[in-house]
């Protein structure tokens, strides 16, 4: 189906708006994936706060121009699925990485975070970023372990002092 100029402008504006509000982006090739599986991916994306769109390459190049995701322009070849993380930088990478494990024909091309291009083989860097809650829990565990260690050392010093006296 041919798109009119107004439709193309609307798509570019929509994707550009998503890119401006996104924390990271992932580009993938979805050739060979069934409609049912793509529908499942879209549903999971909505739940994870990820914007997914299959867009023509010329339109997506225009949409990301002037954003942090302009570095992805060289990856826009063949059918392009672009996913923007809106709530957590690693959400789209984690979602598409898990989907690619289940779908052998689904291929992640690259990702971008803070204007830096991340090749597909390094997608784990982005996918393994802890969420805010996970990072906070890790920090609290570190504080808890440090204070417990200090308490144990204080008790040991007190014991040593009493034994010496």
Curated annotation (Swiss-Prot):
<dbReference type="GO" id="GO:0006412">
    <property type="term" value="P:translation"/>
</dbReference>
<protein>
    <recommendedName>
        <fullName>Large ribosomal subunit protein uL10</fullName>
    </recommendedName>
</protein>
<dbReference type="GO" id="GO:0003735">
    <property type="term" value="F:structural constituent of ribosome"/>
</dbReference>
<dbReference type="GO" id="GO:0070180">
    <property type="term" value="F:large ribosomal subunit rRNA binding"/>
</dbReference>
<dbReference type="InterPro" id="IPR022973">
    <property type="entry name" value="Ribosomal_uL10_bac"/>
</dbReference>
<keyword id="KW-0694">RNA-binding</keyword>
<keyword id="KW-0699">rRNA-binding</keyword>
<keyword id="KW-0689">Ribosomal protein</keyword>
<dbReference type="Pfam" id="PF00466">
    <property type="entry name" value="Ribosomal_L10"/>
</dbReference>
<comment type="similarity">
    <text>Belongs to the universal ribosomal protein uL10 family.</text>
</comment>
<dbReference type="InterPro" id="IPR001790">
    <property type="entry name" value="Ribosomal_uL10"/>
</dbReference>
<dbReference type="InterPro" id="IPR002363">
    <property type="entry name" value="Ribosomal_uL10_CS_bac"/>
</dbReference>
<dbReference type="InterPro" id="IPR043141">
    <property type="entry name" value="Ribosomal_uL10-like_sf"/>
</dbReference>
<dbReference type="GO" id="GO:0015934">
    <property type="term" value="C:large ribosomal subunit"/>
</dbReference>
<comment type="subunit">
    <text>Part of the ribosomal stalk of the 50S ribosomal subunit. The N-terminus interacts with L11 and the large rRNA to form the base of the stalk. The C-terminus forms an elongated spine to which L12 dimers bind in a sequential fashion forming a multimeric L10(L12)X complex.</text>
</comment>
<comment type="function">
    <text>Forms part of the ribosomal stalk, playing a central role in the interaction of the ribosome with GTP-bound translation factors.</text>
</comment>
<keyword id="KW-0687">Ribonucleoprotein</keyword>
<dbReference type="InterPro" id="IPR047865">
    <property type="entry name" value="Ribosomal_uL10_bac_type"/>
</dbReference>
